[in-house]
């Protein structure tokens, strides 16, 4: 069972730790939980890792992986933790992905894989995470009927790909210095008529582009086109179209 939502999260961050969009007290998160059979763990982890990898590569980000292991205070048996950590390691190794061991930094209920994005000035930010959890299904007394007709305990994965969407947007803005690739630019084309007499034709072009699902704006201000063109450059719009 795979369940996901876009939800609001609140944290009591100390005022000195707050940092723009990167560290806030309330943020939006793409949260998902996957309930599975024990024998499905490795394939599900590999699937989630591949999903997050595809997302980050699409946006042009580099990242590194950290595998966080059992903390000093934890729930459950050590044998369960060892099995969980082994499954995470096996999934990463089968995918051929290098990772760093982060001893003792796992969640209290299970080990995790963290994705750390690198921004344009070399800082790293933890965004995506995959947490393997044997404990909460036990606490909530979850069960399924196996092939043998008996009750068994499922295993759960907590996962986020973007993590804090606000943080991800902040990293994205800094990474591209506002000059986004065409496919994610808020405005893809700006239309600049050179005088009022070309306004009607400029509006026809605007409508044609809008109908073609192009994010377009018409700058019809009665100023010199050189000024409108410089504004478009400052706004880092990928394409400016002069009409005249």
Where are these regions (language model features)?
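NTP/phosphate- and nucleic-acid-binding module
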Residues: 1-244
């Amino acid at each position: 069972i795979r369940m996901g939502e876009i939800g609001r999260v609140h944290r009591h961050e100390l005022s000195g730790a707050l940092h723009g969009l990167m560290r806030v007290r309330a943020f939006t998160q793409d949260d998902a939980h996957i309930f599975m059979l024990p024998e499905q763990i490795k394939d599900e982890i590999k699937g989630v890792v591949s999903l997050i990898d595809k997302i980050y590569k699409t946006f042009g980000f580099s990242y590194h992986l950290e595998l966080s292991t059992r903390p000093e205070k934890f729930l459950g048996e050590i044998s369960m933790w060892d099995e969980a950590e082994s499954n995470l390691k096996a999934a990463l190794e089968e995918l051929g992905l290098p990772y760093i061991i982060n001893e003792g930094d796992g969640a209290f209920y299970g080990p995790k894989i963290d994705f750390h994005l690198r921004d344009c000035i070399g800082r790293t930010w933890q965004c995506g995470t995959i947490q393997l959890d044997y404990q909460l299904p036990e606490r909530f007394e979850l069960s399924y009927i196996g092939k043998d007709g008996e009750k068994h305990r499922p295993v759960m994965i907590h996962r986020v790909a973007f993590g804090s969407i606000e943080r991800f947007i902040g990293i994205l803005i800094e990474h591209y210095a506002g000059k986004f690739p065409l496919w994610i630019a808020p405005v893809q084309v700006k239309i600049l008529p050179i005088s009022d007499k070309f306004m009607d034709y400029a509006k026809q072009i605007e409508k044609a582009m809008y109908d073609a699902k192009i994010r377009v704006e018409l700058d019809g201000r009665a100023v010199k086109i050189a000024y409108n063109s410089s504004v478009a450059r400052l706004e880092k719009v990928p394409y400016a179209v002069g009409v005249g």
